[in-house]
């Protein structure tokens, strides 16, 4: 039984001679069937290994393609980051320039505005001065008009009866609107050159 349990390669020549022909054929066929089964199992294992290798090779090819695509995207993103960084630097420089320009412009505007306010104050002071001068001149003209007005009329109760010469009568103070260019003062000069009765010494 122990010899039957082992293979033919484990039997000695005496044990094989002691066995019958039929037993040897039976053991040989059994070992051949076992070897065929092992070969079939090995073939199946090889097929499974080949299938797994093909799957792994396909995954490797897909990973290579994905790696190439990711590398291309990485290059694009790196270029985009470089471009955005340069644009950011350019924007910061432009912002600093605009800030400097705004500071200088606001300073210039404040200076111009201060000058304008100063000029406006000077003009207002000059305007008030001119208004006072105009009021004084107007009062002077009214006073002169009241002083010289009665002399151009008829004489009073103790007078000579004849009024002064027409050229002695002074026109009102200020420029006179000539209208058509005629003059009623008897002046021999140009119609535009009219005397002003603004001072008794005239």
Curated annotation (Swiss-Prot):
<dbReference type="GO" id="GO:0045599">
    <property type="term" value="P:negative regulation of fat cell differentiation"/>
</dbReference>
<comment type="subunit">
    <text>(Microbial infection) Interacts with the viral phosphoprotein hepatitis delta antigen (HDAG); this interaction affects hepatitis delta virus (HDV) genomic replication in intact cells.</text>
</comment>
<dbReference type="GO" id="GO:0030154">
    <property type="term" value="P:cell differentiation"/>
</dbReference>
<keyword id="KW-0965">Cell junction</keyword>
<comment type="similarity">
    <text>Belongs to the CCDC85 family.</text>
</comment>
<comment type="subunit">
    <text>Interacts with CEBPB. Interacts with EURL. May interact with CEBPD. Interacts with MCRS1. Interacts with TCF7L2; competes with CTNNB1. Interacts with ANKRD26. Interacts with the beta-catenin family proteins ARVCF, CTNND1, CTNND2 and PKP4.</text>
</comment>
<comment type="function">
    <text>(Microbial infection) Plays a role in hepatitis delta virus (HDV) genomic replication.</text>
</comment>
<keyword id="KW-0804">Transcription</keyword>
<dbReference type="GO" id="GO:0005813">
    <property type="term" value="C:centrosome"/>
</dbReference>
<feature type="compositionally biased region" description="Low complexity">
    <location>
        <begin position="180"/>
        <end position="190"/>
    </location>
</feature>
<dbReference type="GO" id="GO:0030308">
    <property type="term" value="P:negative regulation of cell growth"/>
</dbReference>
<keyword id="KW-0539">Nucleus</keyword>
<dbReference type="GO" id="GO:0045892">
    <property type="term" value="P:negative regulation of DNA-templated transcription"/>
</dbReference>
<keyword id="KW-0805">Transcription regulation</keyword>
<dbReference type="Pfam" id="PF10226">
    <property type="entry name" value="CCDC85"/>
</dbReference>
<dbReference type="InterPro" id="IPR019359">
    <property type="entry name" value="CCDC85"/>
</dbReference>
<feature type="modified residue" description="N-acetylmethionine">
    <location>
        <position position="1"/>
    </location>
</feature>
<keyword id="KW-0175">Coiled coil</keyword>
<keyword id="KW-0007">Acetylation</keyword>
<feature type="coiled-coil region">
    <location>
        <begin position="118"/>
        <end position="147"/>
    </location>
</feature>
<keyword id="KW-0963">Cytoplasm</keyword>
<feature type="coiled-coil region">
    <location>
        <begin position="43"/>
        <end position="90"/>
    </location>
</feature>
<protein>
    <recommendedName>
        <fullName>Coiled-coil domain-containing protein 85B</fullName>
    </recommendedName>
</protein>
<dbReference type="GO" id="GO:0005737">
    <property type="term" value="C:cytoplasm"/>
</dbReference>
<comment type="function">
    <text>Functions as a transcriptional repressor. May inhibit the activity of CTNNB1 in a TP53-dependent manner and thus regulate cell growth. May function in adipocyte differentiation, negatively regulating mitotic clonal expansion. Plays a role in cell-cell adhesion and epithelium development through its interaction with proteins of the beta-catenin family.</text>
</comment>
<keyword id="KW-0206">Cytoskeleton</keyword>
<dbReference type="GO" id="GO:0070097">
    <property type="term" value="F:delta-catenin binding"/>
</dbReference>
<dbReference type="GO" id="GO:0005912">
    <property type="term" value="C:adherens junction"/>
</dbReference>
<feature type="compositionally biased region" description="Gly residues">
    <location>
        <begin position="150"/>
        <end position="162"/>
    </location>
</feature>
<keyword id="KW-0945">Host-virus interaction</keyword>
<dbReference type="GO" id="GO:0005634">
    <property type="term" value="C:nucleus"/>
</dbReference>
<keyword id="KW-0221">Differentiation</keyword>
<feature type="region of interest" description="Disordered">
    <location>
        <begin position="148"/>
        <end position="202"/>
    </location>
</feature>
<keyword id="KW-0678">Repressor</keyword>
<keyword id="KW-0341">Growth regulation</keyword>
């Amino acid at each position: 039984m122990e010899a039957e349990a082992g293979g033919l390669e484990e039997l000695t020549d005496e044990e094989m001679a002691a066995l019958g022909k039929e037993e040897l054929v039976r053991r040989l066929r059994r070992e051949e069937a076992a070897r065929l089964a092992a070969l079939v199992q090995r073939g199946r294992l090889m097929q499974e290994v080949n299938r797994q290798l093909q799957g792994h090779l396909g995954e490797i090819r897909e990973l290579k393609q994905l790696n190439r695509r990711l590398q291309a995207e990485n290059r694009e993103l790196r270029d985009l980051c470089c471009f955005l960084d340069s644009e950011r630097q350019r924007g910061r420089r432009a912002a600093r320039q605009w800030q400097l320009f705004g500071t200088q412009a606001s300073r210039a505007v404040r200076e111009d505005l201060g000058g304008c306010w100063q000029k406006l104050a000077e003009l207002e002071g000059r305007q008030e001065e001119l208004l006072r001068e105009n009021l004084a001149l107007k009062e002077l003209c009214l006073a002169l008009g009241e002083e010289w007005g009665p002399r151009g009329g008829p004489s009073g109760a103790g007078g000579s009866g004849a009024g002064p010469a027409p050229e002695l009568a002074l026109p009102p103070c200020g420029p006179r609107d000539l209208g058509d260019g005629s003059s009623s003062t008897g002046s021999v000069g140009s119609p535009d050159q009219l005397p002003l009765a603004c001072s008794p010494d005239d």
